[in-house]
Amino acid sequence: MKAGAIRQALILIALALVPALGQAIYFRNQVSWRSRVSASEIVSVDQARSWGDNAMWVDARPAEEFEHDHIPGAILLNEDSWNELLSQFLGQWSPDKRVVVYCSAQSCNAAAEVARRLREEAQLKDNEGKNCVFVLEGGWEEWVKTR
């Protein structure tokens, strides 16, 4: 009796490991604990504030959170409304501006994704052809702490 139960348990474990192993192999280049943003693309609240009028703030949070509160002067540009909001953003942006994208917290990936799309799809660069899109370290939570 015990041998049959152990055998069934081992079969169930093996069956559960097959899809997990397949997913690990398929997504091996997308390790979840690896940061999606390089250190050179992250900016602290203090650094972004020091840019003054040369910084353009982009809120990547859902519209409801933006409407409730946001960084003064920030514009909404998120994944949910990307196609509708991108033209508004591009109308306000110029190559002499540094773009600071933020979302709710450090663990939120929305800012990283919006920043990536601005770099790759909208091909934003500064006047010298360098990166001008940054992700705010700590996101909205960090901004609120340092108000």
Mark where each language-model region is.
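Flexible, polar/low-complexity N-terminal or interdomain linker segments that lie immediately upstream
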Residues: 1-68
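Signature tryptophan residues that serve as conserved aromatic anchors
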Residues: 33, 140-143
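Short amphipathic alpha-helix with an adjacent loop that forms part of the alpha/beta core around
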Residues: 47-51, 84-95
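A short helix-to-beta-strand connector/capping loop
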Residues: 53, 72, 128-132
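Mid-length scaffold segments of soluble, non-membrane domains
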Residues: 56, 60-78, 92-103
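Catalytic cysteine-centered active loop of the rhodanese-like fold, especially the PTP/DSP P-loop
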Residues: 88-141
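Active-site neighborhoods of enzymes that stabilize oxyanions during catalysis
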Residues: 146-147
